[in-house]
A protein has these predicted regions:
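Inward-facing hydrophobic residues that define packing positions of alpha-helical scaffold repeats
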Residues: 43-44, 78, 85, 140, ...
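Bacterial Sec signal peptide processing site at the extreme N-terminus
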Residues: 13-38, 45-49
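TPR-repeat structural position
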Residues: 36-37, 71, 133
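Residue-level signature for tetratricopeptide repeat
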Residues: 29, 64-65, 126
Length: 147
């Protein structure tokens, strides 16, 4: 019976490392080693799959794409992340937003206010890198609105 307590502890802790952190470990390793495009590839499926952590995956992938100088692709993910972040009632998404197809499970992570600001800041930077100064100004104004 001396083995029972450690077994119970091990089983209870095994669930702690799962989910988002475990799923992104490979992508994080690629990102930190400067392989931004590879990190983005590893995050693509999760970023575009409906689920409770989709916003997190989108933010990670969009940031990796930005670092890889893939500004158009980065903007697509940041714009989708922005739409998801703006949804206030996660229990009736299909009724509120017909253009964005997501499941009701997505409500688990809504994002923090600073992340909403970062989305607009990255969009502004991407637009500047693409030579779209008017769009960058729009996103800069959105930063002020979000603050």
């Amino acid at each position: 019976m001396n083995w029972l307590l450690p077994l119970v502890l091990l089983l209870s802790l095994s669930g702690c490392g799962g989910g988002y952190v475990a799923a992104t470990s490979g992508a994080r390793a690629e990102f930190y080693s400067g392989q931004f495009d590879e990190a983005a590839k590893k995050l693509e499926k999760s970023a575009h799959t409906e689920g409770k952590d989709q916003l997190l995956y989108l933010l990670d992938r969009a940031t990796a794409l930005h670092q890889a100088s893939l500004f158009e692709e980065s903007n697509k993910d940041f714009l989708l992340a922005d739409k998801i972040a703006e949804i206030s009632d996660y229990t009736s998404i299909s009724k509120e937003v017909s253009s964005l197809v997501v499941t009701e499970e997505i409500g688990h992570y809504k994002g923090d206010e600073y992340e909403y600001v970062l989305i607009s800041q990255y969009l502004a930077l991407n637009f500047l890198m693409l030579g779209k100064t008017e769009d960058a100004l729009v996103e800069s104004r959105r930063v002020n609105q979000k603050l």
